[in-house]
A protein has these predicted regions:
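Short, low-hydrophobicity acidic/polar segments
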Residues: 10-175
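C-terminal motif of bacterial Sec signal peptides marking the signal peptidase cleavage site
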Residues: 4-7
Length: 176
């Protein structure tokens, strides 16, 4: 004898009228590390830029849902993402519209044409020397369950081992 159980999440209220309630978007972020033996964790207060676009639509403000287009969220102590300060929560569409999420970190409020600029000349601002990017959350319906977003490093990690040799002395390498 086989028996199966299934459960659905009730996101409606109002009995027979089935008035849809507003559902806030929740994210549970993780980071894919450069090194498989190393676990990267978010720090409380880190910022993330969020885009909520109609499923399979072109990446544009016109296709954004509820004007969620480069909006800021912050990492909380529990590792979840939350809208900053007194800003209203990001809400799913109240109909059955599917959405795609694109996220990046750290958040930059003044992106020009949605291009992230990387300038490694000033290493003091190390947060802006490496960006994280996530586009794995696609085809999502509204839910109270946090959306799992996996961030990856956008830029490759390079390690240079420079040694002195012909034409380059050990003294020359000290100034590098």
């Amino acid at each position: 004898c086989l028996c199966g159980l299934a459960a659905c999440e009730d996101i409606y209220k109002g009995g027979e009228n089935h008035q849809q309630t507003e559902v806030a978007v929740l994210f549970k972020p993780s980071i894919t590390s450069y090194d498989k033996d190393e676990v990267e964790k978010w720090k409380e207060g880190e910022t993330v830029g969020v885009y909520m676009i109609r499923n399979k639509a072109d990446f544009s403000l016109e296709n954004s849902i509820n004007q969620i287009f480069n909006k800021k969220m912050q990492v909380q102590a529990d590792g979840m993402l939350k809208v900053s300060g007194e800003e209203p929560a990001f809400l799913y569409p109240t109909d059955a519209t599917k959405v795609d999420f694109i996220l990046y970190a750290p958040w930059n409020p003044s992106l020009e044409e949605n291009v992230l600029q990387l300038d490694v000349r000033n290493q003091a601002k190390s947060d802006f020397c490496d960006y994280l990017y996530s586009n794995n959350a696609k085809n999502k319906y509204r839910t109270t369950t946090p959306v799992k977003v996996v961030f990856k490093h956008v830029f490759a990690k390079m390690i240079f081992h420079i040694r002195n040799g012909e034409g380059i002395s050990a003294e020359d390498l000290k100034v590098l």
